[in-house]
């Protein structure tokens, strides 16, 4: 007798469908909070599976990168070409506390800057802030016509490009190493570093459209909860409740 499965017995009833489980029923929504340096604090929402067994929901949320337009963060449509990256560092209840992770330009903005008859000057440098963040900053600039210039082209010589690039290195290093990450991010929005480069390069060759087009965090210091809360405006100096100086312990009663 052949040993094997009985095909007649193994067949189940036809028409029985498996119970469909909605995957969203096992997930929770979390609010993403931006640092206090931005005008809008509620960035959006994100999903995560509920904590189950050894799997913690917080572990799946920490380290997530969120990309937001600066126009949405500061309610300024003129800054829509800047993209800000935020990293989730801590979870408090249903709130995800984020920190700055990077900045970049949109591709359409970069393409609109590149034109004919001018020289493109680029530079990048690694800098370290006072609070221990190692960043790589990318600067970009374009030559423009001198006052009362008749010639259509504004090409700079290679020696002039090297001099301008050297100025870019010096200014980006100086501006970044003398402040912490929070102050550096605040310099990106009004383009304070770009204006400094434009002013310094005026004696070499006049520039236009000078920007720090990209900032990338290469290395972060050890995570500090108090600094993150300070960045979100939730920290307090008082760690406990104060007790009155003239406090006296009650006397021990002999009988109750």
Curated annotation (Swiss-Prot):
Care to name a GO molecular-function term for this sequence?
Answer: structural constituent of ribosome
Q: Which InterPro entries match?
A: Ribosomal_eS1 (IPR001593), Ribosomal_eS1_CS (IPR018281), Ribosomal_eS1_euk (IPR027500)
Major subcellular site? cytoplasm
Q: Which GO terms describe its biological process?
A: translation
Q: Which terms in the GO cellular component ontology are assigned?
A: cytosolic small ribosomal subunit
The record's subcellular location field reads: Cytoplasm
Which residues does the record list as N-acetylalanine (modified residue)?
Answer: 2
Tell me if Acetylation is a UniProt keyword of this record.
Answer: yes
Q: Which Pfam families match?
A: Ribosomal_S3Ae
What keywords sit in the KW lines?
Answer: Acetylation, Cytoplasm, Ribonucleoprotein, Ribosomal protein
UniProt key word Phosphoprotein: no
Q: Which HAMAP family match?
A: Ribosomal_eS1_euk
Q: How does it assemble?
A: Component of the small ribosomal subunit. Mature ribosomes consist of a small (40S) and a large (60S) subunit. The 40S subunit contains about 33 different proteins and 1 molecule of RNA (18S). The 60S subunit contains about 49 different proteins and 3 molecules of RNA (25S, 5.8S and 5S).
Similarity section: Belongs to the eukaryotic ribosomal protein eS1 family.
Q: What is this protein called?
A: Small ribosomal subunit protein eS1
